[in-house]
Curated annotation (Swiss-Prot):
GO molecular function: ATP binding; inositol-1,3,4-trisphosphate 5-kinase activity; inositol-1,3,4-trisphosphate 6-kinase activity; inositol-3,4,5,6-tetrakisphosphate 1-kinase activity; isomerase activity; magnesium ion binding
Binding site for ADP: R94, K136, H147, Q168, H169, Y170, I171, S194, N210, V288, D289
EC class (word): transferase
Keywords: ATP-binding, Isomerase, Kinase, Magnesium, Metal-binding, Nucleotide-binding, Transferase
Record text on subunit structure and interactions: Monomer.
Taxonomic placement: Eukaryota, Amoebozoa, Evosea, Archamoebae, Mastigamoebida
Family: Belongs to the ITPK1 family.
GO biological process: inositol trisphosphate metabolic process
Its job: Kinase that can phosphorylate various inositol polyphosphate such as Ins(3,4,5,6)P4 or Ins(1,3,4)P3. Phosphorylates Ins(3,4,5,6)P4 at position 1 to form Ins(1,3,4,5,6)P5. This reaction is thought to have regulatory importance, since Ins(3,4,5,6)P4 is an inhibitor of plasma membrane Ca(2+)-activated Cl(-) channels, while Ins(1,3,4,5,6)P5 is not. Also phosphorylates Ins(1,3,4)P3 on O-5 and O-6 to form Ins(1,3,4,6)P4, an essential molecule in the hexakisphosphate (InsP6) pathway.
Catalytic activity annotation: 1D-myo-inositol 3,4,5,6-tetrakisphosphate + ATP = 1D-myo-inositol 1,3,4,5,6-pentakisphosphate + ADP + H(+); 1D-myo-inositol 1,3,4-trisphosphate + ATP = 1D-myo-inositol 1,3,4,5-tetrakisphosphate + ADP + H(+); 1D-myo-inositol 1,3,4-trisphosphate + ATP = 1D-myo-inositol 1,3,4,6-tetrakisphosphate + ADP + H(+)
Native source species: Entamoeba histolytica (strain ATCC 30459 / HM-1:IMSS / ABRM)
Protein's UniProt name: Inositol-tetrakisphosphate 1-kinase
Residues the entry annotates as binding 1D-myo-inositol 1,3,4-trisphosphate: K17, Q141, G142, H147, N291, S295
């Protein structure tokens, strides 16, 4: 009688991440998939016994968890991390993310990493960058400031930019964004309300936090249409889930799968969230954000998650 292979998966997550990710949790579960026995443990601490893989979300680039993670990787080189410190470091840099997306021909709005006001002026003069454009901090995650953003509407607004940063052409997209959540080749998607169409009306720039988009309601008159304010004043901007993007004719399953596969290959990441929009004029998909180990669109079933992670492990480990 042949003994079935057993694979040990260890999910290492802070309690705060567990609460935001899962509907309910289990400290331990075991199941069979593709003739393999998966033994799964969930904990806020690293394991004493070496598992086959550790699934984790590093909450900050520095600090106790980051130090423990790097040390464990060094001491246990055979353990597969989803995702590793190297991936988390890369995904913390908008400059690195965009460079890899551009290198691999992933469609994104025109984007430039800049370190000074003079660089921005040169980009505008050469028409490589045009108004309006969105300003994103270089750091993509782990801090409050990573979500503090600005839309520059007139050239005078350049004076308010904090450097270094990423300047990206602002694309009007009718207040809809498609979010694709990946666990390897397993995809989950949804449409959410997003930033509204903006207009140049003499205002230099406007600020917002992309995790608290209700700030948009206080923007000066003329920047966005009054109807957008009326329609969204009763809802928190960015938190309203709309119909399936396929039903809204925003995209197709084939397009989402193709885009997700290309982004994952470009960045070397398995657990990620991809945000893309469709520009109003041509309707082409443009990737505007990629993040590591996302929320998966709200709380998910623990058993569903670990089964998809196990499937992802078999894909990565080629077993």
């Amino acid at each position: 009688m042949t003994t079935k292979q057993t694979v040990s998966l260890f999910i290492w997550l802070p309690e705060s991440k567990q609460k935001t990710l899962f509907i309910s949790t289990k400290n331990h579960t075991q199941f069979e998939l593709n003739n393999i026995i998966f033994d799964v443990t969930l904990s806020t601490e690293l394991p004493d016994k070496e598992p086959n893989a550790i699934i984790t979300k590093r909450t900050h680039p520095v600090g106790k968890m980051a130090d423990e993670m790097r040390k464990y990787e060094k001491d246990h080189p055979k353990v597969l991390f989803l995702e590793s410190s190297a991936i988390h470091d890369m995904m913390s840099s908008r400059e690195e993310i965009n460079a890899l997306l551009i290198k691999n021909n992933i469609p994104i709005p025109n984007s430039f990493s800049v370190k000074s006001k003079e660089e921005v002026i040169q980009l505008l003069q050469s028409k490589q960058l045009i108004l309006p454009f969105i300003v994103k901090p270089e750091n993509a995650q782990g801090t409050f400031n990573a979500h503090q953003m600005k839309i520059v509407l007139e050239q005078e607004g350049i004076d308010d930019i904090h450097f270094p940063c990423l300047c990206q052409h602002y694309i009007n997209h009718n207040n809809k964004i498609v979010k694709v959540f990946c666990i390897g080749n397993t995809l989950k998607w949804q449409t959410r309300t997003s930033l509204p169409n903006v207009h140049r009306c003499g205002i230099k720039s406007v600020d917002f936090n992309n995790q608290h988009l209700e700030d948009i309601l206080s923007w000066p008159e003329g920047v966005i249409d009054k109807q957008d304010i009326i329609e969204n004043s009763a809802n928190r901007f960015g938190s309203k889930i709309l119909e399936d993007p396929i039903l809204l004719n925003l995209t197709s399953e084939a397009e989402m799968r193709d885009l997700a596969y290309k982004v994952r290959c470009a960045l070397g990441v398995q657990l990620c969230g991809i945000d893309f929009i469709k520009e109003n004029e041509q309707g082409n998909p443009l990737v505007v954000d990629v993040n590591v180990f996302p929320s998966y669109g709200g709380k998910v079933d623990f058993d569903w998650f670990v089964e998809k992670v196990a499937l992802c492990y078999t894909e990565v480990a080629k077993i």
